[in-house]
A protein has these predicted regions:
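A secondary-structure boundary/capping signal
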Residues: 5, 51, 81, 120-121, ...
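Alpha-helical "hinge/linker" immediately C-terminal to small N-terminal DNA-binding modules
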Residues: 10-38
Length: 202
């Protein structure tokens, strides 16, 4: 690449070509780094998210205008259902769900805690009275139960106080597998149920 004599050093033709090529590569690398920095500062593209119906209605959709104002180049495809999705098979980037992670090959991050409260419609309580203990629900009242869209398994009403734990599975007048329909059923006076505190605030 270099010609050396006792008095001077000159660049060979191959050396000059090597230098020119290296300068172009370094310039290209600088351009790539600049574009990546810009991409991080201004993310763009399509984002496929799947969330439960109540989460979509009460937590996600009300904040999408603010999200798009901050990230105008992101296109959101929002799937809304209470069923479990296959991230790979359904080509979904992100899922927001409550509960335990069933697939240990997935990466999960806790984004909050859900507080469930026991509720009933005023009309139901006027008709049936207000229970003073969870066992009264099983003995004297009707409950509205949520069941899994996948397995069909009923989720009990769960009561915890210290070391005491009571699960109520019935009797129920209605079992529902969609969260908005579940809340509507309770509001309609069909029985006692458990919903999140932010659902109750609505």
């Amino acid at each position: 690449l270099l010609n050396r004599t006792t008095r001077r050093v000159t660049v060979t033709a191959d050396g000059a070509a090597y230098y020119d090529r290296t300068v172009r590569l370094l310039t290209d690398l600088d351009d790539i780094e600049a574009s990546m920095t810009n991409a991080r500062a201004n993310p763009r593209g399509r984002l496929r998210i799947d969330v439960g119906t109540s989460v979509a209605q009460l937590l996600i959709i009300p904040h999408l205008a603010e999200f798009h104002a901050r990230y105008p180049d992101i296109q959101v495809d929002l799937g809304v259902s209470d069923r479990t999705v296959d991230l790979i098979g359904d080509n979904v980037d992100c899922v927001i769900r409550g509960g335990e992670l069933s697939d240990q090959s997935l990466v999960a991050r806790r984004i909050g805690n859900l507080e469930f409260i026991t509720v009933a419609a005023p009309a139901y309580l006027e008709r049936k009275g207000t229970p003073t203990h969870p066992l009264e629900i099983e003995e004297k009242h009707a409950s509205v139960i949520y069941f899994s869209p996948q397995s069909g398994r009923n989720y009990p009403l769960e009561f915890r106080r210290g070391d005491e734990s009571i699960d109520i599975t019935g009797p129920y007048q209605l079992s529902v597998n969609e969260s908005n329909a579940y809340v509507t059923s309770i509001v309609a006076g069909l029985g006692i149920g458990q919903i999140t505190s932010w659902q109750a605030q609505q």
